[in-house]
């Protein structure tokens, strides 16, 4: 995937979301030899338990869910202590207003345009309003994840980064799929 700017890695614990994916050692093994920077998304109940491990990889950013159980300030500070960018993700039904007090502390807000935990879902069009709302914060990067494909990419207009899992991974030509999103 030479045309991908980074690799987005979803980590699910089976508690915050019903799906549980691979353990850290499995992820580390899968990513062995991968030179692209990683964008790690912790869809877990206790993100503080995961930061040290994922910071040890080629990680440029760790994002965690605002709805998780750990203290948001402490989690942001822990991520930054490793010299890594901190991102805060919000579910489709979480208003931007709920995370406003953290926006000066994080580097990125990840707008979930589907409910986390399952791939292949349809883009929830109402989440486009959150992108527009977040664009008022000049130093903030906006990332959108969920239901992104060549037909929905325009609904993520205003975002700095998009995550497209199913569309790219289920394509017969990864490079062509990625390029269709960039153009």
Task: Place the predicted regions along the sequence by residue.
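Catalytic cores of alpha/beta
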Residues: 46-56, 94-105, 146-162
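N-terminal active-site wall of soluble small-molecule enzyme domains
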Residues: 8-78
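Hydrophobic faces of well-ordered beta-strands that scaffold small-molecule active sites
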Residues: 7-9, 38-42, 60-64, 86-90, ...
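Conserved, mostly hydrophobic/aromatic
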Residues: 9-10, 54, 109, 134, ...
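Glycine-rich phosphate-binding active-site loops on the catalytic face of alpha/beta enzymes
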Residues: 62-70, 110-120, 159-178
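Alpha/beta enzyme core
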Residues: 1-9, 52-60, 99-112
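Alpha-helix-loop-beta-strand connector modules within alpha/beta enzyme cores
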Residues: 20-40, 77-89, 125-148, 181-183
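Active-site beta-loop-alpha junctions enriched in small/polar residues
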Residues: 12-14, 43-47, 67, 91-93, ...
């Amino acid at each position: 995937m030479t045309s991908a700017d980074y690799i987005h890695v979803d980590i699910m614990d089976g508690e915050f979301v019903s799906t549980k994916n691979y353990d850290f050692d499995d992820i580390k093994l899968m990513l062995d030899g991968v030179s692209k920077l990683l964008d790690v998304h912790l869809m877990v109940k206790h993100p503080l338990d995961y930061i040290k491990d994922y910071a040890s990889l080629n990680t440029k950013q760790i994002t965690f869910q605002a709805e998780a159980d750990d203290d948001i300030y402490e989690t942001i500070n822990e991520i930054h202590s490793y010299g890594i960018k901190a991102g805060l993700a919000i579910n489709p039904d979480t208003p931007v207003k709920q995370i406003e007090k953290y926006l000066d502390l994080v580097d990125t807000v990840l707008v979930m345009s589907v409910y986390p935990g399952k791939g292949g879902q349809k883009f929830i069009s109402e989440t486009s309003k959150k992108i527009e709302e977040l664009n008022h914060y000049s130093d903030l990067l906006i990332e959108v994840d969920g239901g992104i494909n060549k037909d929905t990419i325009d609904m993520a207009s205003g975002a700095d980064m998009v995550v497209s899992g199913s569309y790219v991974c289920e394509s017969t030509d990864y490079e062509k799929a990625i390029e269709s999103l960039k153009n």
